[in-house]
Amino acid sequence: MTTKEKNKSSNSPPPTSFSSLPDDIVLNCLARVSRFHYPTLSLVCKGFRSLLDSRELHATRSCIGKTESFLYVCLDLHRNCYPDCPPRWFIVSPITKQKLKPIPSVTCQSSTVVSIGSKIYIIGGFVDGHSSRRLIVLDCPSHGWRRLPEMRVPRQNAAADVINDKIYVIGGSSSNNIEDWGEVYDPKTQTWEPVLPTTLDLTVQMSVVPGSLVMSGKVYDMNGLKLNFQKNICLVEIENMMCQTKVCEGVLVWCEPEEDRGWCPVDGLEGLPNRPTSPGYLTSVAHSDRGRRVTVWWESAVLHRLGPKWTKECKTEIWCAEISFERRGVGKVCGFVEWSKNVFTKDDYKTYKLPASLSDFFLNSTIVTY
């Protein structure tokens, strides 16, 4: 390098760092980045973390039409090999990757999950061998958990829904006191108040599935004031009609709540890739796209190869597929695979054994839009 070039280089201004730009420009740039990357960006500096948590960023995203929906799931991946290993929370990455990204987790066995805006609330559950009164919130942009004021009574597998920006929680308690039937949480005041059966109008929630209560898309059988959670049933809107879907003996089935035809298989799913050879292989179904689609989940064993030979050890892959629906005449529903991928592979090898029955690793899920 010549002396002239050195002088020119030394006189050049230093490059402008992104963090030195005005906040309004930084906000406009961050608003165009997927929220999936926000937890990583929040580690850059305190200024970034403050902007990512700000209402201004949320307003900017809404203004330019950049709101996104994310599926959060809680999976018990080590239930057979490591019973003491707690379940983990994951976020499903956006198209086209569709991989499970682990996030900091809390236990949620028999808990109820609802979301408001960018926050996920974990209500009650089975903790340390007992029903719990806890309320924990996950801030999705930062993936940070914090405790909130506890419920009045312990509950597990309670029904919950968001009505007028308040969280109504019903059932799930062993108490026979009518004042413990339900309670409502106000996120603004962070207070709980009792809810009596005579003061809460559940006409809409009880009209979708006759004889049952529907809250947050989940179905609960009613026995007087007691509720029985019907696990693994999702309500889905198919051409302006609400139908129930569930996994029955490894097969995705559907029914119309007001018809007597019973449960029927969803057609068109025979071509799902990398499924086990047995006809019934699905383990769980969960909501997707705010009740218009579902995701189905299953496990697949991949044998380990050592040189030219296959061993008896295998890795377990977690597969997920998103399914949309279309009615085909009377009493027939066809499913369409929007995407299907291996979303997670367990690191540990284990000896392959044909399972005696399908093991349900899927514990909970919710969709967050913000």
Curated annotation (Swiss-Prot):
Record keywords: Kelch repeat, Repeat
Coiled-coil ranges (or none): none
Annotated ranges, domain F-box: 15-61
Gene3D superfamilies in the cross-refs: Kelch-type beta propeller (2.120.10.80)
Repeat recorded as keyword: yes
Residue stretches of each Kelch repeat: 119-165, 167-212
Family annotation (SMART domains): FBOX, Kelch
SUPFAM superfamilies listed in its UniProt record: F-box domain, Kelch motif
Cysteine pairs bridged by disulfides in the record: none
Protein name: Putative F-box/kelch-repeat protein At3g46050
Species name: Arabidopsis thaliana (Mouse-ear cress)
Lineage, top ranks: Eukaryota, Viridiplantae, Streptophyta, Embryophyta, Tracheophyta
